[in-house]
Curated annotation (Swiss-Prot):
Disruption phenotype: Defects in phyllotaxis and plant architecture. Morphological abnormalities of several organs. Defects in cellular development and organization of both the shoot and the root meristem. Residues 102-119, 149-168, 253-267 have a biased composition (Basic and acidic residues). It catalyses: ATP-independent breakage of single-stranded DNA, followed by passage and rejoining. GO terms for biological process: DNA topological change. This is DNA topoisomerase 1 alpha. One of its GO terms (molecular function) is DNA binding. It comes from the Eukaryota. The keyword Coiled coil applies. Keywords: Coiled coil, DNA-binding, Isomerase, Nucleus, Phosphoprotein, Topoisomerase. The modification Phosphothreonine is found at residue 286. Interacts with DEK3. Residues 1-369 are annotated as: Disordered.
Length: 916
């Protein structure tokens, strides 16, 4: 077999350490032959043997006389030292015009001997022949190639890449099996090469041609799975493309992608026919041992277990990849040989605040592919601030402000109508942020001396102008707004148009928070495109940045997640704001269904779980006792698990973060809970518990101060880890969904009686209220609640007066007397007693309904029914109940909920949440 040596590889732009820029067929020559083929390889060295194998493109090799050696067959003795040897085919179809004389071959041997010194690495004290012989097999090829057309060498004609590869089309009809037969045979012994390569110096490894992942993918399979193509991104040198599970549709897409690449770049990287043949190899089922039928999540798991890198670290992704969108299953696999080259890239990812954040950071998903193609237009930004020029007063004197200072002052002035305006914490945080904009030497030095009345009055005038607008003007404004937002409202997922949930970037303003949030009043700065990361499909057009002169922070192509965009929360940078598809999208519907199925599955295990934690109430291990008591409280009271809070976050509490002072033991076995729950809503509840639970809580409190943790041996992660041991996938949150749904299902089944639709709706609202109380879904009483109740009361009194008149007229009709005049002085037509009785019945029903509505409004004034409907109640329970009792679903679900739960509308009327 002929060999070729290179004096120095030609690098483009210093990217010589990248081997992914070479055609993939070139990398296949890196495969090491098996020991069983040693004798055959030796015999091939002694004489040239013609072959149909396609020769890879090479960098030009400069000989002493200034000519480029031919890649024709050369006779090279096995004892000849060479720093870079390459087993090449006997005849290359790329350069079929070169002479094959003995003189040329001897000249090539001379050139190879002279360039040996220039490629010596850290093993300078040893001849390469001894290293090669130590491997007990033919040496693997090592050669570096430039992806660009090569430069002239001493006046020689440049080895133009396109012209050479075009000549290769004559071999398009050659069967791939014959072209790559030797490669497949040699791939069987690739396992022994890994240990030898690990011992080689890094420089020597970098000069090798390609980085085959020998410990993960057999060489024979890689050859059959990867078509010849060019990756133009030099930054992806260390990332190997994984095997692609192709379907008949994807084969066509790949062929079209090849044609497009030829048209766009004006050069042929590979014959379309050849690429189609390589792809069809997979379709014909010739690769019996591939893993295309293995779920992608398992393949990710296998990759991470075979790699020395931590699976927790996200893999670097090059954003400007030219990969086609027709390759949905492409994965980045880092070979052992290329780990050193990816060190810097991984470090950047690790140090990023997004990857290291411990709270809601964008992850790589669960490894399951959520979509194949994704196209959207990004997000829409709020309009820029328009200055009004109104001055505020400081100690009675007008003060000039810059545009930035005026914008923030206006944010504060327009909140004069709210309670926040007078809250000390709100004013303090606002002043601290506004003072930074004003500067230390500004005339305004104290917030209390500022009078924002001029701006507030301007604000009221603007509101009044909007109210005075005609219907046509309002309609025109609305249409203009819709026209601007239309293109941002939709995404195309796998060819299906889906509505996006919230595509608007939040405008700047003053943070309010819920309850007594410690950050209320802080400035929410304006979000810019350079802070936003987008997620789209590979090959999809990158959304145009709507703000001139700016650009997106990053563009990802992660099909294991469903978010479309995210950015850091301006108030709490450890948290993120996401843009997802709408609630009615197929992806969201599937996610909801899986959530409720997981909770429903708990019905099969709940008895065993309760038996387990009851037994552990008396466990000797304190940690096990605390886990048992915490699980009991989460199960019986539907408490949230709770997470640790930073000092600058609202001091809300969950089960695992309860303090000793939040729990009071009341003999003989009652516990009073008093703490600030999620959204800073106070949770106050006194419940009767099991005697063993009462005793255990008393023991947990012993010797501790009120600010100490009640469960000092426990946190949320430990609790969830224990629950997952009992039931795979079980977390504390599943208990809330289970308890909410099972409560609704049982109450509706037990309390629904025959009656009209209105009465049945009252039964549903009562059950919904019970769920809301269990989940502590509270709300503050509306400011207009009192006025609404007064209005209803007055209306009921009016109806009762009318009822009295009707009853009086009924009595007069029975006596044959004419009816009395109405309260408005008008005469009333005489009617038969039956007609008066009918009017009385209608009026009584109207009064009864209004009284029922008023009672419900008063009863639910502090209870939020919507939260449990949206997040915790299996919608199939409601839909099935409505079908069984002939209640229109529109009476229970709003229009938005009907869209969100479209997947549940086909449920059978007999559906029950409990499978028992």
């Amino acid at each position: 077999m002929g060999t070729e040596t290179v004096s120095k590889p030609v690098m483009d732009n210093g990217s010589g350490d990248s081997d992914d820029d070479k055609p993939l067929a070139f990398k296949r020559n890196n495969t090491v032959a098996s020991n069983s083929n040693q004798s055959k390889s030796n015999s091939q060295r002694s004489k040239a043997v013609p072959t149909t194998k396609v020769s890879p493109m090479r960098s030009p090799v400069t000989s002493p006389n200034g000519t480029t050696p031919s890649n024709k067959t050369s006779i090279v003795k096995s004892s000849m030292p060479s720093s870079s040897s390459k087993a090449s085919p006997a005849k290359s179809p790329l350069r079929n015009d070169m002479p094959s004389t003995v003189k040329d071959r001897s000249q090539l041997q001379k050139d190879q001997s002279e360039c040996k010194i220039e490629h010596e690495d850290s093993e300078d004290d040893r001849p390469l022949s001894s290293i090669l012989s130590g491997n007990k097999g033919p040496t693997s090829s090592r050669q570096v190639s430039s992806p660009q057309p090569e430069k002239k060498n001493n006046g020689d004609r440049p080895l133009d890449r396109a012209s050479r590869i075009i000549k290769d089309e004559s071999d398009d009809e050659t069967p791939i099996s014959s072209m790559f037969r030797k490669k497949i045979d040699s791939g069987m012994s690739g396992g022994n090469q890994l240990s030898n390569d690990e011992k080689k110096p890094l420089v020597q490894k970098l000069h090798q041609n390609g980085s085959t992942v020998k410990n993960e993918v057999p060489n024979g399979k890689v050859l059959g799975k990867r078509p010849l193509e060019k990756n133009s991104s030099a930054d992806q040198s260390s990332l190997k493309k994984a095997k692609i599970s192709a379907s008949p549709t994807s084969v066509k897409m790949k062929q079209d992608s090849v044609k497009k690449e030829i048209d766009d770049k004006g050069r042929v990287l590979v014959s379309p026919k050849m690429k189609a043949k390589q792809l069809s190899t997979r379709e014909d089922g010739t690769d019996d041992d591939d893993d295309d039928d293995v779920p992608i999540s398992k393949r990710f798991k296998s990759d991470s277990s075979n790699s020395n890198t931590s699976s927790a670290k996200p893999k670097a992704v090059k954003l400007n990849s030219t990969s086609s969108a027709a390759k949905p299953k492409a994965r980045n696999v880092v070979s052992p040989r290329s780990r050193a080259m990816t060190k810097n890239t991984k470090k950047v990812t690790k140090d990023s605040k997004y990857s290291t954040s411990s709270k809601s950071s964008p992850s790589s998903g669960d490894g399951q592919k959520k979509w194949t193609t994704l196209v959207h237009n990004g997000v829409i930004f709020p309009p820029p601030y328009k200055p009004h020029g109104i001055k505020i007063l400081y100690k009675g004197k007008p003060v000039d402000l810059t545009i930035e200072q005026e914008e923030v002052a206006t944010m504060f002035a327009v909140m004069r109508e709210t309670d926040y305006y007078t809250k000390p914490q709100f004013r303090e945080n606002f002043w601290n942020d506004w003072r930074r904009l004003l500067g230390k030497k500004h005339v305004i030095q104290k917030l209390d001396d500022c009078d924002f009345t001029p701006i507030y009055e301007w604000h009221l005038e603007e509101k009044e102008k909007k109210k005075q607008m005609s219907t046509e003007e309002k309609k025109a404004l609305k249409e203009e707004k819709m026209k601007q937002e239309e293109k941002y409202m939709w995404a195309v997922v796998d060819g299906v148009k889906e509505k996006i949930g919230n595509f608007r970037v939040e405008p700047p303003g003053l943070f309010r928070g819920r309850g007594e949030h410690p950050k209320m009043g802080k400035l929410k700065k304006r979000i810019h495109p350079c802070e936003i990361t987008l997620n789209i499909g590979k090959g999809a057009p990158i959304p145009e940045c709507p703000i001139a002169g700016e650009r997106w922070k990053e563009v990802k192509h992660d099909n294991t997640v469903t978010w479309l965009a995210f950015w850091a929360d301006p108030i709490n940078p450890k948290e993120f704001k996401y843009v997802f598809l709408g609630a009615g999208s197929s992806l969201k519907g599937l996610s909801d269904k899986e959530k409720y199925e997981k909770a429903r599955n708990l019905t099969d295990h709940i008895d065993n779980i309760r038996t387990t934690y009851t037994k552990n109430f008396t466990a000797k291990d304190v940690k096990m006792r605390q886990i048992a008591v915490a699980t009991y409280l989460i199960d019986k009271l539907a408490l949230r698990a709770g997470n640790e809070k930073d000092d600058d976050e609202a001091d809300t509490v969950g089960c695992c973060t309860l303090k000793v002072g939040n729990v009071e033991c009341i003999p003989p076995n009652k516990i009073k809970f008093d703490f600030l729950g999620k959204d800073s809503i106070q949770y106050v509840n006194t419940v009767e518990v099991e005697p063993l639970v009462y005793k255990a809580i008393g023991q947990f409190q012993a010797g501790k101060s009120k600010t100490d943790d009640l469960f000092d041996e426990l946190d949320t992660s430990k609790l969830n880890a224990h629950l997952k041991e009992l039931v795979p996938g079980l977390t504390a949150k599943v208990f809330r969904t289970y308890n909410a749904s099972i409560t609704l299902d049982e109450m509706l089944s037990q309390e629904t009686k025959d009656g009209d639709v209105t009465q049945k709706i009252v039964v549903y609202q009562k059950a919904n209220k019970e769920v809301a109380i269990i989940c502590n879904h509270q709300r503050t009483v509306s400011k207009t609640h009192g006025a609404q109740i007064e209005k209803l009361t007055a209306r009921i009194e009016e109806l009762k007066e009318v009822l009295k008149e009707l009853k009086t007229n009924l009595d007069r009709a029975k006596k044959g007397k004419p009816p009395l005049e109405g309260s408005d002085g008008k005469k009333i037509r005489s009617l038969e007693p039956n007609a008066w009785e009918k009017k009385i019945a209608q009026q009584s029903a109207k009064i009864e309904k209004m009284e029922r509505d008023m009672h419900t409004k008063e009863d639910l004034k502090t209870v939020a029914l919507g939260t449990s409907k949206i997040n915790y109640l299996d919608p199939r329970i409601t839909v099935a109940w409505c079908k069984r009792h002939e209640v229109p679903i529109e009476k229970i679900f709003t229009k938005s909920l009907l869209e969100k739960f479209a997947w549940a509308m086909d449920v059978e009327p007999e559906y029950r949440f409990s499978r028992r």
